[in-house]
Amino acid sequence: MAFLEVSVQCQERSQARYEEVLESFGALAVTLLDADADTVRERGVFEPGVGETVLWDVVVLSALFPVETDALGLLAGLEGAEPGLDWGGVRFRVVVDEDWERVWMDQFQAMRFGERTFIVPWNQAVPVEASGMDAAVVRLDPGLAFGSGTHPTTGLCLRWLDRLGGDGVLGGGDVLDFGCGSGILALAALKLGAVYAVGVDNDPQALLASRENALRNRVAERLEVYLPAEAPVRRYPVVVANILASTLVALAERLAGYVAPGGRLALSGILRGEEEEVLRCYAVWLDVLGCEEEDGWIRIDGVRRC
């Protein structure tokens, strides 16, 4: 299916007015983009506060219209719709809708983390290098949930779990994956020796993806998933939390409380520059063993004090 895409650049303060006009002319969807993307001025917007909408200083609005829309007629209408809005830089182009799931699966390839952990798309063969070794192979279809192994925060956690598995820390114990997404970390822990895993996420779609991936990996009877309010109150020898730094800070007492005395905790999803605040919040409970960084993202790991 094809669409007519209309793109216009504006200041953040006038974004809502442009969006309202585009929608009034029948826009099927409006996407907001950073006008400085892929430049040195690019600025990440990760997590707004409650009731807050955070945008870039200069925004590109990209609106989709039916492909048969008369572009010149639409432009004339936009220019006369509301005084003060500048449509001089508007751009039109025809875009073709793609099977994005197929495109993504074509790009998602098997990956290795650490010594023996492999994340393999569910529809691909296990890599040759995984044969002949005690590989921990996780078959994965993330669906709509976060966690395919391609993001640095996930990779940092997978390498940590791989190391724990190699050191025998996971053997015979339980693991909590807080912010489980697709279930990738919980499943990796099970494949690396954990007996049982619990996944917690505030997104019901993530819980569904975790269950489906557990079935795909034949460990469904060893994984339970919960919304945060329903998660059992207990302690675990190993806890991993791959969420945002602000959430790690807000939930510090709760997350530390999940870790058994002498247990291991990994905190990920931390941008460079945010680690000091996270370390400060966990200092009362955690003896830090180390930090690892990849592409500006940091993982902190430590041991819960007795």
UniProtKB/Swiss-Prot annotation:
Gene3D superfamilies: Vaccinia Virus protein VP39. SUPFAM superfamilies: S-adenosyl-L-methionine-dependent methyltransferases. GO terms for molecular function: protein-lysine N-methyltransferase activity. Methylates ribosomal protein L11. It catalyses: L-lysyl-[protein] + 3 S-adenosyl-L-methionine = N(6),N(6),N(6)-trimethyl-L-lysyl-[protein] + 3 S-adenosyl-L-homocysteine + 3 H(+). Its EC number is 2.1.1.-. Pfam families: PrmA. Belongs to the methyltransferase superfamily. PrmA family. GO terms for biological process: methylation. The gene is prmA. It is found in: Cytoplasm. This is Ribosomal protein L11 methyltransferase. It comes from Xylella fastidiosa (strain Temecula1 / ATCC 700964). NCBIfam families: prmA. Keywords: Cytoplasm, Methyltransferase, S-adenosyl-L-methionine, Transferase. GO terms for cellular component: cytosol. The keyword Zinc does not apply. InterPro entries: Ribosomal_L11_MeTrfase_PrmA, Ribosomal_PrmA_MeTrfase, SAM-dependent_MTases_sf. S-adenosyl-L-methionine binds at T154, G179, D201, N242.
